[in-house]
């Protein structure tokens, strides 16, 4: 049997659309309860179960209001999803999912059902199937094991449809027919009856058909006899035709032979003519070729061929030599390219090596300068002048390393001393902090205890204060209790319940008499209606005619002016529809134009935005480029600045070269003047007169030599800056070009495009405004006409109905002629109204007495409750007075503890203040130590780092110098210069060789051209001799053909050919006559066979036999159908009566155990046979109604019961139907079952439901789902052993529904 286990809901009604809003509910067995206030979303759960099981939406919605509103969610699209996990009738797990989509359009919401998914779990694996809605509906009905009507009307009945058992007759009949599946069985009986009638008709048709089949069978036998006779005549005719054919065959062969010889003669004659024509053409061609040649070769053919072949061989050898020269020339060109490439690479390498040599000298000078600077800074002796040797440099590094170690050691010692002092201060601070923290924790603990004790003390004092007035309250309670008991006794004594009950019995008897009188009047009214129906119909038709005339007049007066202004006249429906169609077409065309213009405007706006963005980018790019250019140049005159900078670099380069050369010259001059004892100036050869003059020159040269390196360094530094600036400016050349392009081309073009687009946009806006104005004029006219169309359609319908009414009035008037009745329907109806008024009065008195009984019972119950409450309060006060002394002692004890705690907290706070002052002082001393440590450490580190940086720079220069020497760059430079000279020599030799080959190739091309002319003359001679040979062959072939024709006897062949044709014609005529007779026989035979193949004669005997079998078989089948129809009809009646008896028994038991009123003993469903069914119609229909019984009286419950009785009756009928029809599905959902029920009936309903659960608790798949807002009703159900948990349905802060599982014990403590 099937049962539901779990369901998740997302995006349905008030359930949220986010994943976090998804609500999952697990269904308990046997009872699941959902509690919540109105609007929380309880009924939505029933709607979800119904939708996922049947695919039907709740009443009054087609789906769009079933999904969470997109406007509320502030979303365009809202997806809803419901998933259900359940067990099918076989106990297998099934998961089903249905999804929906609701989209918010401009004026309405659009709903769409998405594809559903059914998933089964077989052998631990999921098997999913995507299905359409109809397929899922069928699958769900199959899985749950109940019909769709039972699911909709019994198991998951919606709250709005819950009272359907008391609906009007037609709707009630339809519901019960669907539940009983009566329609299907009635259709089955109809089908059986129709089949039986069809089979009977078929028997008659078979008998008629057999008559004609017997005639066809006899006719077929006659045709077969005629075919046998004609086939014998045909055989004789065929032998005659064959004799003629044998005689004709040798004549045809001889004729064929003669025709072959004649065709051969014709062919030879044609060939001779063709050879004559070919001979003339060949002679003409030879003559033309001889005229074209200057002279004809006179030697033999062998001499001509040898001369031609030798000539060709000479030409081929020269061409091969020409190709070889061409290859050699290409090879030399390739070799020259490689040599040029190698020369370029060597030139680049030579320049690079020269630059490295210059840089090497610069590194040596920079190293010596740094050593002198650092030695002076560290006060090291022996390093005042350079250059320095390797030993001096090594000694310098050793001295610097020792100095670094001394500085590092001193700094480390100072840092260590300051760190020790800092750690000492930190330890002192930690000790004080620990002491302070301990006091703080103690204060917190004592304060917390103090707060608790103070709260406890206040509570005890409040209770004592309340108890002070308890003595007086006991006296008041005694007085109130005495008064309440007196009132209770008085109320019980004055109660008239028994009298009222007796009066109710009398009134019920009177009511029964009035009911009988009313039924008699109904019978009389029915008899009168036989004659008065016509009169009533006449009156109704006359009134209907007046009403329709008035309606037509109103419609015309309401729309006459408006339609006349639109069309110029008052139209009929067809004219107005045509006008609307043309107007709608005009509106659609206008809308299309407007949409197209809007699309063009959007495109233009987008283009404008794109152009604006592009213009803004270009302007920003121009500004950025100009700023960069100004930052580098200092002005906007880029070209002039660049030219001036190049001139400055050239000047600085010359100055650097001069300073570099001056250093070498000054050194050489000083050496010459000192080492060689030269007495004259090395530059001007002037002789020095004295030693002092010589020393003065040397001193001057040394001074210039000392200043030269600094000047050289300064010049090089300035040159590098200028070169860097030049490189930066050269790098900005493309940017300068971009600035020019932006200013002169790109930005002006964009501005022009922007102006053009703005003009287009303005034009489009004007067009759109014009179309919108037109649309605003036409659309109100169309809307106005549409409103009028509805009324015009109604008016035309009224006019047609008016004609029909007038015709019916005439018919009824003819029927009323001569009719005269004494007692009218109005008189009977008036008497019936009087009786009905009395009946209503009696019913009102019964209800009034019942209300009085209920009011008196409620008053007595209220007084009893009040008495019990006063007794309970008095007992509680007496108990509290006994605890008074204990609370006073507790007050004294608590006051003492509070005072003690206050003292302890005060002492602790006084100890904390001195600790905070000392701690602050230590913190200040510690920060001073840290500052001293950081300052001294920074100074020492800066000094050490400065030395390290300078040593690092010296090492860098030394490494570059060593690398240059170790790499052998000087030798490598000389080697590359030698290689360059060799490449230049090879390149010159290659050019000379190429020139020589070019001359040789020119000579050979001239020789080849001369040889080609001679070759053409030899070739023409060969062609001429070949054609002369072919001409001789043609003449020989012509002579041979003439000789062959002369040997044939042409005249004799033609005479014989003519005689043979005459003989053959005679035989053919005789043959044709014989063949004609043969074809006549064949056609007759074919005609008979064709006639025999016609439908009525083909297989006539077999058809006759088969039809006989069909007729006998159909007769037997018809008898069986008659038996089966009667059996099924009897079974349907039996099933219906058994089910109705079973349902009514359950309804009686449930009503008696639930309903606490005395006016209705029980209720039941009556199924009466349809009295309107004619005797000829064998279909049996049932009309259903719910009746209430008191004694022997049964009344229709519809229209007579109260709202509470209606709810209870509908609920009990659904319970009975579920008990009867849900054998495979033990699920039942009750939505607000306590609606309109009083407290007594609510309690009895709860007791009845518990009994139902108890009786079906052994059925493991029984599931009752109860939805209610009445927590008292839930508490009554919770007193049973079947409820431990229930669900609360509520709205969260986002006003989305939430489902929360709660314990049944939490009912009393829950606050809405």
From Swiss-Prot:
Modified residues (N6-acetyllysine): 959
Residues given in the record as Zn(2+) binding sites: 681, 684
UniProt domain Zinc-hook: residue ranges: 635-734
Residues reported to bind ATP: 13, 38-39, 41-44, 67, 69, 159
Phosphoserine modifications at: 635
Coiled-coil zones: 200-534, 635-673, 706-734, 754-954, 1019-1075
Co-factor binding details: Binds 1 zinc ion per homodimer.
GO molecular function: ATP binding; ATP hydrolysis activity; DNA binding; double-stranded DNA binding; double-stranded telomeric DNA binding; G-quadruplex DNA binding; identical protein binding; metal ion binding
Keyword line: Acetylation, ATP-binding, Cell cycle, Chromosome, Coiled coil, DNA damage, DNA repair, Hydrolase, Magnesium, Meiosis, Metal-binding, Nucleotide-binding, Nucleus, Phosphoprotein, Telomere, Zinc
Domain notes: The zinc-hook, which separates the large intramolecular coiled coil regions, contains 2 Cys residues that coordinate one molecule of zinc with the help of the 2 Cys residues of the zinc-hook of another RAD50 molecule, thereby forming a V-shaped homodimer. The two heads of the homodimer, which constitute the ATP-binding domain, interact with the MRE11 homodimer.
Complex formation: Component of the MRN complex composed of two heterodimers RAD50 and MRE11 associated with a single NBN. The MRN complexes dimerize on DNA to form joined MRN-MRN oligomers required for DNA double-strand break repair. As part of the MRN complex, interacts with MCM8 and MCM9; the interaction recruits the complex to DNA repair sites. Component of the BASC complex, at least composed of BRCA1, MSH2, MSH6, MLH1, ATM, BLM, RAD50, MRE11 and NBN. Found in a complex with TERF2. Interacts with RINT1. Interacts with BRCA1 via its N-terminal domain. Interacts with DCLRE1C/Artemis. Interacts with MRNIP.
Job of this protein: Component of the MRN complex, which plays a central role in double-strand break (DSB) repair, DNA recombination, maintenance of telomere integrity and meiosis. The MRN complex is involved in the repair of DNA double-strand breaks (DSBs) via homologous recombination (HR), an error-free mechanism which primarily occurs during S and G2 phases. The complex (1) mediates the end resection of damaged DNA, which generates proper single-stranded DNA, a key initial steps in HR, and is (2) required for the recruitment of other repair factors and efficient activation of ATM and ATR upon DNA damage.
Protein name: DNA repair protein RAD50
Native species: Rattus norvegicus (Rat)
UniProt lineage: Eukaryota, Metazoa, Chordata, Craniata, Vertebrata
